[in-house]
Every structure is written in structure tokens, then in C-alpha cells.
A protein has these predicted regions:
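Phosphate/ribose-phosphate-bearing ligand recognition and processing surfaces
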Residues: 72-82
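Short, structured patches in soluble enzyme cores that scaffold and shape functional sites
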Residues: 25-29, 47-50, 69-73
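Residue-level signal for well-ordered alpha-helical segments
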Residues: 66, 70, 117-120
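Long, charged alpha-helical interface segments
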Residues: 7-22, 26-28, 32, 36-44, ...
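Catalytic cores of nucleophile-dependent amide-cleaving enzymes
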Residues: 40-41, 49-66, 74
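Structured catalytic-domain cores with a bias toward divalent-metal coordination
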Residues: 2-10, 21, 50, 62-69
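A short acidic, often aromatic-flanked loop/helix-cap motif at beta-alpha or helix-coil junctions
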Residues: 1, 53-55, 76, 159-160
Length: 164
């Protein structure tokens, strides 16, 4: 189908290609997590990663409501880069929220242990090696770069919309 020959690499979606267009994107585990959150009655669902970390944190603090951070992983398995991002969020919101969860504590510790050199640490994880085999090292480095995409996708009325 014309126009549907794209993957999930950030480099495949330059601004001039996506600006002012409607995109339909599905992922293996991210889509599953979205459906699970909807099934469980989530009030608000936002999509976060290091490139929009500050927008995620700002939104969560504005809402001042209980939060569940869902790490979608890869092939239904634990994924370090997702947990690192959760740890980064927790680091930024922990003074505004009570956190009583071992997995959150662990994510925050992992992030704090590696936050000063994420590029070096990320090169040790399994996903780096999978993507490196396809020449996608720059994708991983982009995905751990903070605040390079100052937008906030929010799921509302059956669609992800951008809260810039």
C-alpha cells in the first residue's frame, strides 16, 4: 500500500514528512499496553520517552493524580530502556508524589546509577545489539536524548492527539 512502507525508526519520520498529517502507527507491545490501559479504565493515557521527558513530567505534576507508568517492553519481556525512562520520570516527580512500589524504586535506582552516561550504558543492553545488527545505533541514541521532541501524545476519544 503506498505510504505504508515505514517502520518504527524515528529517522523514517522527519518533520517535513509528518507535519500536518494524520499518522497511524502500531507497535508490538506499545499497542498492547494501550489496549490494556483502556480495558482497565485508565482516565488519561499519555505516551512518553526520553525525547519528551519534560512534557511528561509537567503533565503528571499538573494532573496531581495517581499515576501508573507502564513499560511496554519488547516481545512481552522486560526491556531496560523502558525501565530507564520510568526511572527518569520517577526522579523528576518523586518529590510531588508518594511512591511505594519496589519496581518504581528499582527503576529510579537504575536510572540514577546511569543517568550521567546513558549513551555508554545503553550500548550494553540487549536491544542495542539487536538494533545495531540493522545499523540503527543512532535510533537508540536518539531515543535516550532528553527533550528533543517537546510534544505530548495523549489518547483521547479513540486517537492519540498531540499536546504541544
Amino acid at each position: 500500500i503506498p505510504g505504508l512502507a515505514y517502520g518504527n525508526s524515528p529517522s523514517e519520520y522527519p518533520r517535513d514528512f509528518i507535519e500536518n498529517k494524520i499518522l497511524v502507527i502500531t507497535t508490538t507491545n506499545g499497542t498492547k499496553l494501550l489496549h490494556l490501559a483502556l480495558k482497565q479504565g485508565a482516565k488519561d493515557i499519555i505516551t512518553g520517552s526520553f525525547p519528551n521527558l519534560s512534557k511528561v513530567v509537567e503533565y503528571l505534576k499538573e494532573q496531581n493524580a495517581p499515576v501508573i507508568l507502564g513499560c511496554s517492553g519488547w516481545k512481552n519481556r522486560f526491556n531496560i530502556e523502558d525501565v530507564l525512562f520510568a526511572g527518569a520520570v520517577i526522579e523528576e516527580i518523586k518529590d510531588a508524589f508518594e511512591i511505594h512500589c519496589d519496581s518504581s524504586f528499582m527503576a529510579n535506582q537504575l536510572y540514577n546509577q546511569h543517568k550521567n552516561d546513558l549513551p555508554t550504558y545503553i550500548k550494553t543492553v540487549t536491544h542495542w545489539h539487536r538494533l545495531a545488527a540493522y545499523g540503527l545505533e543512532e535510533d537508540m541514541l536518539y531515543c535516550i536524548s532528553k527533550d528533543t521532541a517537546p510534544s505530548l501524545p495523549i489518547f483521547k476519544d479513540g486517537a492519540l492527539i498531540n499536546k504541544a
